């Protein structure tokens, strides 16, 4: 992997991890479009340090952007403020992904990390976003209004991201719509849910990283982490402002993008 490939992959990671367009699908599709031999399995086997640093960069951006939320929630552990309830809802929402990820992630990744399969599920992701937009409740609930079972449902939808092509944020934002959250609160809850998941993904790989450190990869990995972090921060800023100011058809552009890219890649494979 060269410098140019590292920059492109880092930007793609930072943007697609938080935009509802599936980071895993893009990690499969982008190397295919550029003609690179860099599958997710290859990256995890040979460039694990780079992958971990991209996740760390994204995690730092999430924490920095939502630092006020996390500060309130951590302080709430020592009092009876509403923020304690928000923290509990986030914990509940992460349970499905932790359980299902521990059981099925490796199997699913090995089975579905294929350009054709990723493109098919990217189309399904677009259809989910479109259907979610058309059927959302136009709610005005805030995060603290959620019941425990509703947070669990949103967490279950987030688990769809284990399948390459489905977006973690797209699935959880759509579920948030169905649970009656407002546009901005649905996006906020999705981002807050993403933080422990992305951080956990990096943490789980650290023991492998220590064992299989590749000499000379540190500088490329640091650059990848910084670029992914900056791209992620900008993506969060754009996404939150988008959901705050636009009340209708919020998911439609992302749905169209996923469907068009998925169909385009499938068509290129068929030619």
Curated annotation (Swiss-Prot):
GO biological process, one term: peptidoglycan biosynthetic process
UniProt EC number: 3.6.1.27
One Gene Ontology cellular component: plasma membrane
Molecular function terms, GO-annotated: undecaprenyl-diphosphatase activity
Keyword Phosphoprotein: no
Parts of the chain that traverse the membrane: 1-21, 46-66, 88-108, 111-131, 146-166, 190-210, 220-240, 251-271
InterPro entries, per database record: UppP (IPR003824)
Reactions the enzyme catalyzes: di-trans,octa-cis-undecaprenyl diphosphate + H2O = di-trans,octa-cis-undecaprenyl phosphate + phosphate + H(+)
Swiss-Prot/TrEMBL keywords: Antibiotic resistance, Cell membrane, Cell shape, Cell wall biogenesis/degradation, Hydrolase, Membrane, Peptidoglycan synthesis, Transmembrane, Transmembrane helix
Subcellular location per the Swiss-Prot or TrEMBL entry: Cell membrane
UniProt entry tagged with the keyword 4Fe-4S: no
Membrane topology: Multi-pass membrane protein
Enzyme class at the top of the EC tree: hydrolase
Top-level taxon of origin: Bacteria
Family, per entry: Belongs to the UppP family.
Other notes: Bacitracin is thought to be involved in the inhibition of peptidoglycan synthesis by sequestering undecaprenyl diphosphate, thereby reducing the pool of lipid carrier available.
Record function comment: Catalyzes the dephosphorylation of undecaprenyl diphosphate (UPP). Confers resistance to bacitracin.
Protein name per UniProt: Undecaprenyl-diphosphatase 2
Species of the source: Oenococcus oeni (strain ATCC BAA-331 / PSU-1)
Gene name tied to this protein: uppP2
């Amino acid at each position: 992997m060269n410098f140019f490939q590292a920059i492109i992959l880092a930007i793609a990671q930072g943007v697609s991890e938080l935009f509802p367009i599936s980071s895993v699908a893009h990690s499969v599709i982008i190397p295919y479009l550029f003609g690179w031999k860099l599958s997710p399995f290859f990256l995890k086997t040979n460039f694990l340090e780079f992958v971990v640093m991209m996740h760390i960069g994204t995690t730092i951006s999430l924490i920095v952007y939502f630092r006020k939320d996390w500060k309130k929630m951590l302080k709430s552990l020592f009092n009876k403020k509403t923020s304690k309830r928000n923290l509990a809802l986030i914990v509940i929402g992460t349970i499905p992904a932790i359980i299902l990820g521990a059981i099925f992630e490796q199997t699913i990744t090995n089975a579905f990390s294929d350009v054709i399969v990723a493109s098919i599920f990217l189309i399904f992701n677009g259809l989910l976003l479109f259907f979610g937009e058309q059927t959302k409740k136009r709610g005005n609930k805030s995060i603290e209004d959620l019941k425990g079972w509703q947070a669990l449902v949103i967490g279950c939808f987030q688990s769809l991201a284990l399948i390459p092509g489905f977006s973690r944020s797209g699935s959880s934002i759509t579920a948030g719509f169905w649970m009656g959250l407002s546009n901005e609160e649905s996006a906020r809850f999705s981002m807050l849910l993403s933080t422990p998941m992305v951080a956990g993904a990096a943490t789980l790989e650290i023991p492998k990283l220590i064992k299989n450190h590749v000499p000379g990869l540190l500088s490329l990995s640091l650059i990848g982490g910084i670029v992914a972090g900056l791209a992620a921060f900008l993506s969060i800023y754009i996404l939150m402002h988008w959901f705050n100011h636009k009340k209708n058809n919020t998911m439609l552009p992302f749905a169209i993008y996923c469907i068009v890219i998925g169909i385009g890649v499938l068509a290129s494979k068929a030619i």
